[in-house]
Amino acid sequence: MQHLSSPPYENYFYSDCHAASQVVVTSPRPDSNLSIISPRVIVAWPAGNSGIVTYFQPESGINGTLGIQMANSSIGSPLGPYYDDSKGGNATVGVCAQLEFNSTAVLAVAILGSIRTIRDFTEGPSLLRTDVQGGLKYSVIPGGVEISRLWFDNITTTTLSLTSTNQTRGPIKLDNTSVTFPAGNYTFNASFNYPQLTQLTSEEVLSTASADLITQSPMQTTALSFLSYTTKLTAGAWRFLTYFGRDSMIAALLLEPVLSEGRGGAIEAVIAGVLERINRTDGSVCHEETIG
């Protein structure tokens, strides 16, 4: 797991043999512009170009008083894997963590959808898509609350749950689509059952001649690995943790001297990703995927 701190944003990157996830926790600071920065948690998955965003607000109504953070616990440091293959079909994968509120928090907005949908909301006019939001299901589960959404493919389901620990100060309250969490720690699970990608390791994404970069620039090569998969290279994190045809081709051209070639290499992944998404009718190249 990698942790990059850039207050008020805390970025966490987690990947294993089952899935890759990025989690961004935003907790306003005293000098933050509260008109554009509010407490939120984002989960982004390169598989399916999908994710989750949750916006919280202080029950007191006083902006800037609610602080949230990920805490190290027995389930992760702070992130841990979520894996369940008991339902048949694609395994349900994702991340889990312990989320801490310093005061009573109200979940005001939750979006379970494509990264494009989430990005448009966070950076645009904050408009909610009714076709996405209408599919959300809120339910009470033992010790907490669960939010789920069935994708338009009628197969994939994204699920978010928060459950109390012994360090919370009262019960969770669900009122329609508003959820109130007393101050304390909560187990946070974010998962989905979409087919997963195969990540390229640092050794696989770089050419043999460039392997020394792994020791010379470990953070950069680890980041490149997180964005690279056998069937596509993603454009960035978190807002662009998806396929972008133009960006992928330009990046491949610029990085060609150090990228691996041939079967299973990074250059092949870029070309394969572009070819797979070419419009069969007019030959145009797909600019961006919006699956989730």
Question: Language-model segments: which ranges?
Answer:
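Terminal accessory carbohydrate-recognition/targeting modules of carbohydrate-active enzymes
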Residues: M1-M249, L253-G265, E276-D282
